[in-house]
C-alpha cells in the first residue's frame, strides 16, 4: 500500500474511533494456515488493514463467575464488536471507492464466504484477527494466544 493511501486509511480509522491501526503486507501471512489467511478470502490480496479498539480495563477485570443468564460487565464486547464492524465496513468502502478490492471482515465471525482450495468448511473463522494484529505490527503473540500490544499489555 503506498504511503498516501496508508495515511488516508489510518486517518479514517482513527477518526472513526480505532485505538490502534496497522497495515500488514500479505507476505506476512505466507505460512499461515489457510483458515487464518486473507488469501483464503481474497486470493489477490496485497495488504491487510487491522484495527483495534481497547477494552475498558474494568470490564475485563471485574468480570467473573456470574449467573449464566447475566451478561455482566463484559457485555461491552457487543458494542465494541459493532464498532469494529463499522470500522471495517467504512474502510472497505473507502478502498472500494478508490478502485481497490476490499473485503470487510466482521470482528467476530465464524462463517466463511466460500470454500478455498481443499478447505470446503463454511463453519470456520474468516481469518485470525489475533495473527493479523501481529502481522500488522500492533503487538506480539503472547503465551495466552492473544495479540499483546505495547499500549495495552496483556489485560
Each language-model region and where it sits:
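Catalytic cores of enzyme domains
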Residues: 32, 73-155
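Non-catalytic, usually N-terminal nucleic-acid engagement modules in DNA/RNA processing proteins
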Residues: 1-89
